[in-house]
């Protein structure tokens, strides 16, 4: 891992960018999230699933790819509001460590895990992965790598590879983008409207965020020594997730404005509905990469 001044500065920048979005307000996010407080793509195994059911299905889909056994230690990089760790402890009887750069999520996760009836250890650290040096058995990271910056990918995957034993497995869940050439080859229209929307997302919603292509992920994980054993696209599932988030936020419009402001409400509605459209048009995808040592 890089320990030079540039790396340190970038880490601090990541903290600022993450907190700018995720520390907006727990109460605001709760208006459109399901009861698990999962803020990532759901998995609709059946058409009649509720958002809550689909989020639990996504947690099970994710954890089921890791080969977890009782007593193992699972590291969750970018642990959100703790739903993955909670499910892992309850269903797989493992120890969990969560890393987050969000102060609000750090406090919330600890409260969630403290309520779980288990003898396994559970810790949530307000820390960047670059400052974590303990051995773990499995690693999961869901929609976090988009905040890292491409220049940190090699260090991150090297960190993950070295943290696990010889049979280690990592589940990387990431939104992925396309090169302009790929957009053209697939016949997806290049419009000024979408260009402006992408600028809005990286400026007003996820400052500093960058989407990797599938090829970028493949390049960096194999360079670190991993073998990709499976790639699963969740593209239509994310479009539906965003639809349901937007519907829920719209249904709580007055509360959202009271908690934040009309400007924030309108900004988030634009973000949720616009991203759903981007997934349906094929500009972006969401993929789960299963990585084995």
From Swiss-Prot:
Pfam families, per database record: CMAS
Superkingdom classification of source: Bacteria
Active site: 275
GO biological process per UniProt: lipid biosynthetic process; methylation; mycolic acid biosynthetic process
Residues reported to bind S-adenosyl-L-methionine: 39-40, 78-80, 100-105, 129-130, 142
Keywords tagged on the record: Lipid biosynthesis, Lipid metabolism, Methyltransferase, S-adenosyl-L-methionine, Transferase
Lipid metabolism as UniProt keyword: yes
SUPFAM superfamilies tied to this protein: S-adenosyl-L-methionine-dependent methyltransferases
UniProt-recorded Gene Ontology molecular function terms: cyclopropane-fatty-acyl-phospholipid synthase activity; O-methyltransferase activity
Signal peptide: none
InterPro entries for the chain: CFA/CMAS (IPR050723), CMAS (IPR003333), CMAS_actinobact (IPR047672), SAM-dependent_MTases_sf (IPR029063)
Entry-linked CDD domains: AdoMet_MTases
Example of a GO cellular component annotation carried by this entry: plasma membrane
Enzyme Commission designation: 2.1.1.-
Metabolic or biological pathway: Lipid metabolism; mycolic acid biosynthesis
Protein family according to the UniProt entry: Belongs to the CFA/CMAS family.
Function: Involved in the biosynthesis of methoxymycolic acid. It catalyzes the O-methylation of the hydroxy group of the hydroxymycolate to form a methyl ether.
Protein name (Swiss-Prot/TrEMBL): Methoxy mycolic acid synthase MmaA3
Source species of the chain: Mycobacterium tuberculosis (strain ATCC 25618 / H37Rv)
Source taxonomy: Bacteria, Bacillati, Actinomycetota, Actinomycetes, Mycobacteriales
